[in-house]
Amino acid sequence: MKKIVALVLAVLMLAALTGCGETVSGSDKYVIGICQMLPHSSLEEASRGFQDALTAALGEDQVVFRHQDAGGEYATCATIIDGFLAENVDLILANATVPLQAAVSATDTTPVLGTSVTDYATALNMPEWTGLVGGNVSGTTDLAPLDQQAAVIAELFPEAKNVGLLYCSSEPNSVYQVTRVEGYLTDMGYTCTSFAFVDVNDLSAVCEAACAASDVIYIPTDNTCAMYTENIANVVLPAGVPVVTGDASTCAAAGVATFSISYYDLGVVTGEMAASILTGEADISTMAVKSVDAATKMYNPVNCEKLGITIPEGYQPVA
């Protein structure tokens, strides 16, 4: 009997010791929840860069990623974030504005890093913006120099008069970009008209209206536009209206040129931030929002040929 009792106690002690220090993955690995807004290439590249950088910093055997896509739905973002919190993940990557908003609403303790977010002040309703979110939130911004995006239009289409600004009205960061770019273009002598659509159901109709009224169209970094680039291309290319975009993925399908950052590099910066937070080298509450150092002029050779547009030196083919 004593031997049986001793054996039971030994098993219980072993189980207790095994449970010490475990994370949700059942090991001592860091568990990272990634909530990505949409399945398009810019966001995919940001997620990939993040995972590569964090894996390189911590070691492949030290980190596990839970990567989920919200399919463009806010409610799904909230559900994904709630699932991560229930699982007690070590850090959340919110890839795009809506996942960031959902994560900030859901937790003030679990570290949250945003990426592919254009303007944190707008996204988080912080009018007194200092570059620091504070608390348990920081991240990276994908905001390329908007004055340089306007300058691309001036360089390629100096004879144009009317610029259509096409964007999704439900994306606050798109409104921010369009407002800024409109100011730059107006100062350059262009007449700008906004063409805002609600969702994919009215995108084609709004795009047709933009084509009818515009010599050239500008599309900001807009996740909804990026998800439905084929819909846009099916309207603008037959209409013969060139599109300058805020990101490379939209340009690759529907545009002729862009001045864009590398979303992979953006993800790398975010992954390096995550590593410093998880290892205790940095305090997220004092970590300012970061960006990548450079943006690149790119063009779409296929669409330029279709529309008879000659691109000057200094532009790289979009991937």
Task: Explain the meaning of each model-derived region.
Residues 172-241, 247:
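Pocket-lining segment of extracytoplasmic ligand-binding domains
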Residues 27, 120-162, 261-282:
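Hydrophobic alpha-helical segments within soluble ligand-binding/sensing domains
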Residues 276-319:
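Hinge/cleft segment of the Venus flytrap/periplasmic-binding protein
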Residues 31-51, 66-76, 222-227:
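Extracytoplasmic "Venus flytrap"
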Residues 67-128, 222-246:
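Beta-alpha junction/loop-to-helix N-cap segments that form part of ligand/metal-binding clefts
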Residues 1-31, 56-60:
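Short, low-complexity disordered leader/linker segments with a strong preference
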Residues 56-77, 136, 182-200:
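Short beta-strand elements in bilobed, periplasmic/extracellular small-molecule ligand-binding domains
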Residues 32, 50, 138-185, 287-303:
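An alpha-beta-alpha
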